[in-house]
Amino acid sequence: MTSVTVGLEVYEITRSTFMVSLVGVISLVPMILAGLYGGMLADAFDRRTVALVSAVMAWVSTAMIAAHAWLGLDSVVLLYVLVTVNAVAGTVIGASRAAIVPRLVGNDLLPAASALNSISAGFSVTVGPAVGGVLVAAFGFAPTYTVDVVLFSAAFLGVVTLPRMAPEHDALRPGLSSLVEGARFLRRSRNITMTFVLDIIAMTFGQPRVLFPAIGALVVGGGSITVGALSAAYAVGALLSGVFSGPLGHVRRQGEAVGWAITVYGGAIAAFGVVVAAAHLLGGRASETFSTGILPALALCALALAVAGGADNVSSVFRGTILQAAAPDGMRGRLQGIFIVVVTGGPRVGDLYAGLVVAAGFAWPPLIGGVLIIALVALLLRLVPSFRRYDALHPNAN
């Protein structure tokens, strides 16, 4: 909810899609450092403690964003800082929590665990953006942030009830030696590296969220309601694919499945780009008031984004399973740190890509990006045949 609301608030203050894109871009470098260091912390210390401390940090930053809105400061710089702190904390939480999962379940249950996690995440991001858009339209930014602060408090329960997760073996203390050890392992592990590279491609060229405020204000119309609907459509697709993910546990060629899922994702993003470009060429609808006249374009955009969300979730389930099954426990924290950096940092690079393309005068970044995704995935799967042949029954990092 907060991520959507911050984007709307920055757009309200600046009326600039590029400034909205900077919400994610500015936090990218700190988040990369946090992911790397947080992963080392998860390998060296009790993973439950690392997750709990990070959750407190994330809650405090969310509360400060709400305070900023209540005080009416309208400071884009302060919003950038607070969102960066929140992203840093979230990266460390993700690294430590994901490294915990293989210690709780066996390899045969990892796809099911990943799918269950995707259902939980999908539900939160489905309800969050939709409710966020409606609350902003009805009550404004401050009450919307406050609701998120209250809901975020419930997240502590899941972390507190986890068992202690001390390292199974002696681990290097966080520092350069630990980082180098993880980097060397990753360099030798082509299959794990491919999960990162493919996701970077998908998120860099296929992340249209930074365009949503402008689409709602200038192209499709509908303002914050449209932004919430588009954000929710993506999440609904992810949620539904998680709910019906039972057959994924029987897929052995998981690397090949990742390739197909990301290819479908690229096609869906390209279709979304076609609808947006067509609406733009037809003159757009410069209105932030929701009306039935925008429903055809909004429905087509939402359908494409729902397919994209579903495909992205399937890809995420398999990529996460490959990483957790093929990596030794002593490396999982560091590799999960890199994984979280990729899955959260990639969209921020995608925000910059979309913002720059629009700033250059083009309205078609999703269309161009979707085609690039399809082409690059096909090329990489041909260049790395071991990834296509990856067998879930015989996990192999190489």
How should each PLM-predicted stretch be described?
Residues 1-398:
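Alpha-helical transmembrane-bundle signature of multi-pass membrane transport and export proteins
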